[in-house]
Regions:
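Conserved P-loop NTPase "ATPase switch" module shared by AAA+ and STAND
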Residues: 110-131
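Conserved alpha-helical scaffold flanking the Walker A/P-loop in AAA+ ATPase domains
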Residues: 98-114
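The catalytic "switch" region of P-loop NTPases
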Residues: 70-73, 137-227, 306
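Walker A/P-loop nucleotide-binding motif
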Residues: 29-51
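Post-Walker A helix-loop "phosphate-sensing" segment adjacent to the P-loop in P-loop NTPases
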Residues: 54-64, 94, 143
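Pre-Walker A adenine-sensing motif
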Residues: 16-29
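Conserved NTP-binding/hydrolysis module of P-loop NTPases
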Residues: 69-97
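C-terminal alpha-helical "lid" subdomain
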Residues: 4-16, 47-55, 67, 77, ...
Length: 340
């Protein structure tokens, strides 16, 4: 039976998360608005969930439930404002019953009752025009309520390169987008959170050593920092040549190598397993794996061996001269025998 490594699926406070959560916390405490962009696979969703849970723990349960930081994922392929509103109601634990025209104003009241201080929209690059208009209407209503209830807003997007999602929308000359742009933070309206340097990769590897120490008594990942950094800045994983390492491929490389080493009951990860895991992420990432029953694979292997053996046993084809000699009659037989 193959040994299976117990994997860690919790939150790791990486340098990227410190930078990213710092912006979210600023929006929460100062009620500021930001458009935040980071590369896919950098760990945005994990950071949002951790800060949301931390804010709820700090608020406590005295006086009922409170959600200081309310986070939702932008609805895909549904541009209606009701789609985003239903997700906000669901995050508050309220079912989507009744007409949206009635639940819409119920949502305004619930945001105040549950003490929501900051809205975070993950995958905000998928927001439609009705979604953005609804967010402005929602925040306007709460700001003019009595007592006033200003909300922070973080639109978290995924992107690469120099482009900033949603910026072209807010740069339009219509009054609606001028008002939206005016509410963005004056110092940090658009923020790009970068991933990890080589030194920060070393810090993450040290943290992973502590996490997986019970399974690997002699685990020493930090000695492979240079090699791992080189592998993970391969042009296929870093097409922008930023020299930064994303958390997702880093965790995939390390955990894959640890799984293989653990299956062989090794006390430390081996360089061969690390190199093979790096090749899976780069050179062999587009390889198609054939998944089939074990018996079928064995039968196919046996058939291939039999076919190769039969080909080797086949006599070699004779040349033209040998064939002509076979056709010639022997000296004992007449060339044209007469019929009896």
């Amino acid at each position: 039976m193959v040994r299976k490594l117990p994997l860690f699926d919790g939150f790791i406070e990486t340098p990227f998360e410190l930078r990213f959560q710092g912006l979210l916390r600023q929006a929460w405490l100062q009620r500021s608005w930001h458009v935040i962009v980071a590369e896919p696979g950098s760990g945005k969703t994990m950071g949002i969930g951790d800060l949301r849970d931390e804010a709820a723990r700090q608020a406590g349960m005295v006086g009922g439930r409170r959600y200081p930081v309310l986070a939702v994922t932008t609805p895909k392929n549904d541009p209606r404002e009701a789609a985003l509103g239903n997700l906000l109601l669901g995050a508050l634990g309220v079912g989507a019953r009744g007409r949206w025209s009635e639940r819409k104003y119920l949502l305004y009241d619930l945001l105040g009752q549950y003490g929501v201080e900051c809205l975070v929209c993950d995958d905000a690059h998928d927001l439609s025009m009705p979604h953005l208009i609804f967010l402005k209407e929602l925040t306007d209503h709460l700001f003019l309520a009595f007592p006033t209830h200003p909300l922070g807003l973080c639109l978290v997007t995924a992107g690469r390169g120099a482009s900033i999602p949603l910026k072209d929308v807010f740069d339009q000359p219509e009054t609606m987008w001028m008002q939206f742009r005016r509410r963005l933070d004056c110092l940090q309206p658009y923020c790009r959170v970068v991933s990890h340097t080589e030194g920060e990769v070393r810090d993450i590897l040290i943290a992973l050593e502590q996490i997986y120490r019970p399974s690997f008594p002699a685990l020493n990942l930090q000695q492979w920092t240079g090699s791992i950094y080189t592998w993970l800045t391969h042009p296929l994983l870093d097409p922008q040549k930023s020299g930064r390492v994303l958390m997702d491929p880093l965790m995939k490389l390390v955990t894959t190598a640890l799984k293989w080493s653990y299956a062989q009951a090794e006390a430390d990860v081996t360089s061969q397993h690390l190199k093979a895991a790096a090749e899976l992420l780069t050179l062999r990432r587009d390889k198609i794996q054939i998944i089939d029953a074990e018996n079928n694979r064995l039968k196919e292997d046996e058939q291939e061996k039999q076919e190769s053996g039969e080909e080797q046993k086949k006599p070699k084809s004779k040349g033209r001269k040998a064939k002509e000699l076979e056709k010639q009659p022997s000296s004992d037989e007449p060339e044209n025998p007469s019929p009896k």
